Amino acid sequence: MLLGVNIDHIAVLRQARMVNDPDLLEAAFIAAKHGDQITLHVREDRRHAQDFDLENIIKFCKSPINLECALNDEILNLALKLKPHRVTLVPEKREELTTEGGLCLNHAKLKQSIEKLQNANIEVSLFINPSLEDIEKSKILKAQFIELHTGHYANLHNALFSNISHTAFALKELGQDKKTLQTQFEKELQNLELCAKKGTELGLKVAAGHGLNYKNVKLIVKIKEICELNIGQSIVARSVFTGLKNAILEMKELIKDEKTSH
């Protein structure tokens, strides 16, 4: 199973002071050396990663570059110009802290955007909610890749296996009793397994991402149809204490151990 290292949160730290430190390109070099892919989200408002970040990373890094972006003409044209290995199309709201859900597959521009990117020899992935309907639509749209949104799984795991429900970060919608949460958690995990199998059956390559960390990744790794995980915030958070190289290698070890032991 491959690890795409999302380095957005390195850019978050840089933009907090609007300086050149930490250097996103240096982070990309470390991610390229110890991970399998660099993932970067260039948002419409450029609140974190900037155009020059993407340009420099594509120019100087040999690893595959996975650009996450919305259906925004300016950024899509940037992708067509710079030609990352892959573009993952994601939904985007200006007020959100992080991507809140899967892409709406009924968007009028979606099919045309996919065709333009593929005609430029750029692989296209769709970041979708884990539903059979969205997987079938992704196949109809002729995407090569799908990335299953694991946010709900991650939130349920947090509610069950951490103290988050007793903190300011508790989610009101997950304020149920443990038994109910456990049932929902098992159902969501089964749904991810079913969706990954369906995607593979349809000839789609299947990735997963959002909210994955060192504690909840193990069960996802057991889903053999998933070939890639894109993980960012938890790796960058761990790197504050261990360094980026060690944080990436620790996640790689978790993925390797789970895959080889099952």
Curated annotation (Swiss-Prot):
Family annotation (PANTHER family) = PYRIDOXINE 5'-PHOSPHATE SYNTHASE
The gene name on file is pdxJ
Answer whether the UniProt record assigns the keyword Hydrolase to this protein: no
Reaction equations catalysed: 3-amino-2-oxopropyl phosphate + 1-deoxy-D-xylulose 5-phosphate = pyridoxine 5'-phosphate + phosphate + 2 H2O + H(+)
Provide the GO biological process annotations: pyridoxine biosynthetic process
- Residues binding 3-amino-2-oxopropyl phosphate: N6, R17, G211, G232, Q233
**Biological pathway:** Cofactor biosynthesis; pyridoxine 5'-phosphate biosynthesis; pyridoxine 5'-phosphate from D-erythrose 4-phosphate: step 5/5
- Indicate the residues that form the catalytic site: H41 (proton acceptor), E68 (proton acceptor), H210 (proton donor)
- Species source reads Campylobacter jejuni subsp. jejuni serotype O:23/36 (strain 81-176)
One Pfam entry for this protein is: PdxJ
What's the stated role of this polypeptide?
A: Catalyzes the complicated ring closure reaction between the two acyclic compounds 1-deoxy-D-xylulose-5-phosphate (DXP) and 3-amino-2-oxopropyl phosphate (1-amino-acetone-3-phosphate or AAP) to form pyridoxine 5'-phosphate (PNP) and inorganic phosphate.
Annotated positions for site Transition state stabilizer: E147
Give the protein family.
Belongs to the PNP synthase family.
Entry keywords, A to Z:
Cytoplasm, Pyridoxine biosynthesis, Transferase
The broad enzyme category this protein falls into is transferase
Please verify whether the record's keywords include Cell division.
no
Q: Which HAMAP family match?
A: PdxJ (MF_00279)
Name a GO CC annotation attached to this entry. Answer: cytosol
Can you tell me which residues bind 1-deoxy-D-xylulose 5-phosphate?
D8, H9, R43, H48, T98
Q: What is this protein called?
A: Pyridoxine 5'-phosphate synthase
Q: What is known about its subunit structure?
A: Homooctamer; tetramer of dimers.
List the subcellular locations: Cytoplasm
The Enzyme Commission number assigned here is 2.6.99.2
A Gene Ontology MF term for this entry? pyridoxine 5'-phosphate synthase activity
